[in-house]
Amino acid sequence: MKHQARLQLTAVALSAAVLLTACGVLGTPATPTPEPPRVEVVMSSAEHVVGANRVTLVVLDEKGKPIEFGWGRARFFEISGDSATLRSETDVFFRPIDLEAIPGHAHQLFSTHHLDMQGLWLTEATFDKPGPWGVEVSVDQPGKPLVVARTRFDVLAASSSPAVGAPAPRSRNLIASDVKNISEISTAQPPGDMYDVRIADAIAAHRPLLVLFATPAFCTSRVCGPEYEIVQTIQPLYARDMDFVHIEIWKDPANQVPMDTVTEWGLRSDPWVFLVDRNGTVRHKFSGLVTVDELQEAIEQTLAVR
């Protein structure tokens, strides 16, 4: 199906809320076709900036269940007023989380997943200017009608969090020995063993480091996913070679007051994963859900830095 390069969209059609729309093709088809099922696309990656971006999406069917197979396509639009101009188009691939592939994995009862996700749709996109943008995602599944959904998002001029290639903040984060009860710095039940290392101390000791910013019990995103569980499951595979630190998002969850380290790292969403090399430089960062394969590949690359 051929789409015109410029698509007129009303302000309602690309509102700040997620769209539930039919196909955005202009023109009248030669023969009547059934209206595609009403679906929803949710951005898993919460931060997008001018330049190259990793974009992750969750596509929900008419019953609110994640769509996890098929051939995907994404079109990115720059929005100006009530019009949207096509800027790029790319394939979107479904990537399973694949926790079961890790030896010794067992599902943790404390994990709070807002959606029963087994993975996410992944692509890359380059944005040339800040401001409002939109994405239209289509998924073609064998034996099913084409599904199409749109949403809008903002592109920032620059990230508020540490950039890849920049020094990581030398944070003096709270650790287990600083508090009377581990629940002061972890909402995980039971808590793991990512609370014994200060970020500043790991960097000073030239230890590679994974820093996870997430809140297992108070996930505020619909697609925050099992990030804590993913990192905790991977940790034993690399614990000899690097340190793992979990930072809760909220100091005061009821009033949404963030932890000091969250503020120091400039984070405005969750979850986030940062990989810091032995020189204290940020090598990878992930906004939103990250798959096991992506995370392990990034860890291996970080450990290889001398």
What residues fall within each predicted segment?
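Short active-site neighborhood of thiol/selenol oxidoreductases, capturing the structured segment around
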Residues: 181-183, 191, 199-220
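Typically the conserved alpha-helix immediately C-terminal to a functionally engaged Cys/Sec
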Residues: 221-238
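Thiol-/selenol-based redox modules, centered on thioredoxin-like
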Residues: 159-162, 169, 175-180, 193, ...
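C-terminal motif of bacterial Sec signal peptides marking the signal peptidase cleavage site
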Residues: 19-22
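Active-site-proximal beta-strand/loop segments in catalytic clefts of secreted hydrolases
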Residues: 213-216, 247-250, 287-289
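Bacterial N-terminal signal peptides that target proteins for export
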Residues: 2-12
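Contiguous segments within soluble domain cores/interaction surfaces
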Residues: 28-128, 132-185
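Thioredoxin-like thiol-disulfide oxidoreductase module
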Residues: 239, 245-270, 275-282, 292, ...
